[in-house]
Amino acid sequence: MIAQSTSNKNKTQSRTSGYAPVNGLNMYYEIYGSGMPLVLIHGGGSTIQTTFGNVLHGLAKTQQVIAVEMQAHGHTADIDRPLSFEQDADDIAALLRYLHIDKANIFGFSNGASTTLQFAIRHPEITNRIIVASTFYKKTGAHSWLWEMMSNSTFESMPHPLIDAFLEINPSRDALHKMYERDVARMQSFKDIQDEQIQAIKAPALIISGDMDVATIEHTCEMHRFISNSRLAIIPGGHGEYIGEITTPQNSTLIAATVSIINGFLNTTEVK
């Protein structure tokens, strides 16, 4: 592990980073702050910073943030095995065991939120609370334009900020292309989660979506109804705008409000 310090708007926070051997993968992670562990799981084609760079330090004021980069993304090299949200969830569980963490909160965005749902389903004994942001658990829960975009997707359509962020960490264009192709293929073959599995989630949940997000508001509300111990936040804006994801308009007021909502959820003694 490597101990460093990082500055954010005149606030210096201690950062520990390293690689964990999990299920044949060398998973990169960064740790900020102290308190109850909160694992951050980025979206598809992304890195820690592109997804969470604008909220990470605000969240680390009240808990120990453990930000990860999943298989084939950022600092974490690809290996010869399929990409799946189930495998990603098992990798997070293995990381927590490696770090000797018995229970954690999990915050996933987009693809990372699909992993978060799988984590709560597959590893309930180490799940404290979950934050499920901008996702759906069945194909019909997403707007049809998403699937049209996925079926016609080409590398040239990948957002340039995500390309630049990947290459800054890993200059291999072959690795970048492979990551892109594997992420797209995973979405093109998206597997529904059964309603009964969603209903079986017992961990307190905060479900967040933009009002112009990839998931329909109706589906997001259905997920809220199915997870009995959940809260729902529909926030103005598109996919990831409320956390300042790198490809979205940067609205500092909206981002600060989202951090406040998340911290409030995590620090509330009981969710009903």
Where are these regions (language model features)?
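Active-site loop/oxyanion-hole signature of alpha/beta-hydrolase fold enzymes
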Residues: 67-107, 249-256
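Active-site nucleophile elbow and catalytic-triad environment of alpha/beta-hydrolase enzymes
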Residues: 181-197
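Short beta-strand/loop motif that positions the catalytic acidic residue
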Residues: 201, 207-209
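Conserved alpha/beta-hydrolase "acid-adjacent" motif
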Residues: 214-219
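Catalytic active-site module of serine/aspartate enzymes centered on a nucleophile-bearing elbow/loop
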Residues: 236-272
